[in-house]
Amino acid sequence: MRKLMILLLFGCGGGSAKYHVDDASLASLSMEEKQGIFAAQNEKNQAQAEFESFKANYRNVDHDVDVADNEYKTAKLQLDTAKMNMKNAEQNADVNRKTSAQRDVQVAELGVKAADAKVDWLKKKRKWIGYSQDAAEKHVAEADARAELEKAKLAQAKGIKPDEKFDPMLFEQDYQEKARKYNDARLDAERLKPDVDGKEREYMTQQQAYDQARSNAMTMQH
């Protein structure tokens, strides 16, 4: 449900200002006078590119989560098999097989822990990317509103009235609202990042322990 919600929420991409100034009304003004507008439009383009990047990353990590879920199921199956082999060795009072089976169980348990830690990390990473995508989308809307505000301020300064209902204060209010939403979304994503990094470190530690135990077990078999 969480995955579907994020895809629906972010699928449309981008965002736009609530109020707009007709570019034709500013056509007679110089490029230099429009520098503030161009700067905001450039920021919007960068934010849109960032949004598209997060959207692609979300799809990739979503796939990685599915793969990791399957790896966890495989690890659990290997542990169940190792436990059954150990039980069989105990029932047959086979000391050598029991010792080997106990070692297999210990290795398989570490495999389950590593697989579980990987799923936990990737799900947390997916959530962070979703939040970052949301922030980037709101950044697009904020930059677009700023571009329109720059147009409105320039029109006002030059005594230009693009339409009868033209009110620069409405542009300012729209920009401030979108800037607040972007800032809140950005902070939400930033607050989540340390937890993602922590989960990754936990996974790496568990994976290293599993790899080492598996290597030791293979050495003892030979």
Regions found by a protein language model. Name each.
Residues 42-77, 81-84, 180, 187, ...:
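Extended alpha-helical stalk/coiled-coil segments
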Residues 168-222:
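C-terminal amphipathic alpha-helix
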Residues 1-13:
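Sec-dependent bacterial lipoprotein signal peptides
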Residues 12-31:
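Bacterial Sec signal peptide processing site at the extreme N-terminus
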Residues 61-172:
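Extended alpha-helical coiled-coil "stalk/arm" regions
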Residues 5-6, 37, 47, 86, ...:
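Sequence-pattern detector for short linear motifs
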